[in-house]
């Protein structure tokens, strides 16, 4: 009944108008699973490879017909007839078929599309929501959203070096209340920016992209919006940052071009610690560059007991890299991006390893997204307690929030909002 009878890949567009891969998996009983693959702008050097065609005459070289061909050809040939319930075996078959350490031959975008579509087809066959199929009966925790309300760095055309300024409504009683809180702050911030003469255009992830001179200036606007919306910063709402420091780490220095200064690893750690002391910042992602292990150790020693230090480019959802961080004591959290590693099995393994080591895990989107809401289900399935999926604008972002609203309603009295417990180890 759950044997795979067809796998259909196609080229679609993501939220930036670039091609990406979408896959349908059809089972013997007629069940269909569909998954669309996201794409990042600030990508880690250690991520699995996203296969692009490189034909400049077509989509400026960004086409994904080679990946689609891999889906419809080699991957279907290898997986046709296999049981969709055998997720681990299916993912391992694709990894071995690719034969490279970074999925560079067939493409992580091809492999991931199939991996997720297989799980969704199997869930459909059992008439189960994806979060229940993957997570079992214990999957009932709704995550605290990290809502990206000011964009900078690679996600916006403005001078701010830090990539994301986010709010976390930890004090809400439910996910739906947290979403309302975030929406009210988002719209209040828009009014405050307009009043101050700033533009309110949005970046790739739906946050505002004003021309502000520094991180402090952005944080001051966020703090003002929280208060004016009727919430208490540090109690109802916490702040999270994603400097995406690899993007401005040059020749051993963190170069803040807008501010005209450069900081060494120890100075960068002290600068971030100072921000944590002055603002209710409870999470910093990629505060140090992906290969600046000295810097990661410095910041972990300095504020690791009071701030969530999330490794994104550092760990790239890879258990080998995460194991090194755990062993050597740097960072205390991992960002989970399904397309950084390329299969559902490896994604779940990274979350499990993090939790066993006492690290937190944050389920995450990419800046190039689609209307696919799989990560909302995975956040609940893994009970990770936190999700990062952009702002309160752009349908590619709100699709994930809306799916979480549906899940919360479906769970009813069983639903549990993670709230402050998601960050209990900090503050």
Swiss-Prot record:
It catalyses: (2R)-2-phosphoglycerate = phosphoenolpyruvate + H2O. Catalyzes the reversible conversion of 2-phosphoglycerate (2-PG) into phosphoenolpyruvate (PEP). It is essential for the degradation of carbohydrates via glycolysis. This is Enolase. GO terms for biological process: glycolytic process. It is an enzyme of class 4 (lyase). Its EC number is 4.2.1.11. One of its GO terms (cellular component) is phosphopyruvate hydratase complex. The keyword Flavoprotein does not apply. HAMAP family: Enolase (MF_00318).
């Amino acid at each position: 009944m759950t044997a795979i009878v067809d796998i259909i890949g196609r080229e679609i567009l993501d939220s930036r108008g670039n091609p990406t891969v979408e896959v349908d998996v059809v089972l013997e009983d007629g069940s269909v699973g569909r998954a669309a693959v996201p794409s990042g702008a600030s990508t880690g050097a250690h991520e699995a490879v996203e296969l692009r065609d490189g034909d400049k005459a077509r989509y400026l070289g960004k086409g994904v017909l080679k990946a689609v061909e891999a889906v419809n050809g080699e991957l279907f040939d290898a997986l046709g007839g296999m049981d969709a319930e055998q997720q681990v075996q299916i993912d391992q078959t694709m990894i071995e078929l690719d034969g490279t350490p970074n999925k560079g031959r067939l493409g992580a975008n091809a492999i991931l599309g199939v991996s997720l579509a297989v799980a969704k087809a199997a869930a459909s066959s059992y008439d189960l929501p994806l979060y229940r199929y993957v997570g079992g009966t214990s999957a009932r925790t709704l995550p605290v959203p990290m809502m990206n309300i000011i964009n900078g760095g690679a996600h916006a055309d403005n001078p701010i070096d830090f990539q994301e300024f986010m709010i976390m409504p930890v004090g809400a009683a439910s996910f739906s209340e947290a979403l309302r809180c975030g929406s009210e702050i988002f719209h209040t911030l828009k009014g405050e920016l307009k009043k101050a003469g700033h533009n309110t255009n949005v970046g790739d992830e739906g946050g505002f992209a004003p021309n502000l001179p520094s991180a402090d200036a952005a944080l001051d606007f966020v703090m003002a919006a929280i208060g004016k919306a009727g919430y208490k910063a540090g109690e109802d709402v916490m702040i999270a940052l994603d400097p995406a420091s690899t993007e401005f780490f040059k020749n051993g220095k963190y170069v803040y071009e807008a501010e005209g200064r450069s900081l060494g690893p120890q100075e960068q750690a002290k600068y971030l610690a100072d921000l944590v002391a002055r603002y209710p910042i409870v999470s910093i992602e990629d505060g140090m560059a992906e290969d600046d292990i000295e810097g990661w150790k410095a910041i972990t020693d300095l504020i690791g007991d009071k701030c969530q230090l999330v490794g994104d480019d550092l760990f790239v959802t890879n258990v080998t890299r995460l194991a090194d961080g755990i062993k050597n004591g740097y960072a205390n959290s991992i960002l989970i991006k399904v397309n950084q590693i390329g299969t559902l099995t490896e994604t779940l393994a990274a979350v499990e390893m993090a939790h066993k080591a006492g690290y937190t895990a944050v389920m995450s989107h990419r800046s190039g997204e689609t209307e696919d809401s799989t990560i909302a289900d995975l956040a609940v399935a893994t009970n990770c307690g936190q999700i990062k999926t952009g702002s309160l604008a752009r349908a590619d972002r709100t699709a994930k929030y809306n799916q979480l609203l549906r899940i919360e309603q479906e769970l009813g009295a069983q639903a549990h909002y993670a709230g402050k417990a998601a960050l209990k180890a900090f503050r």
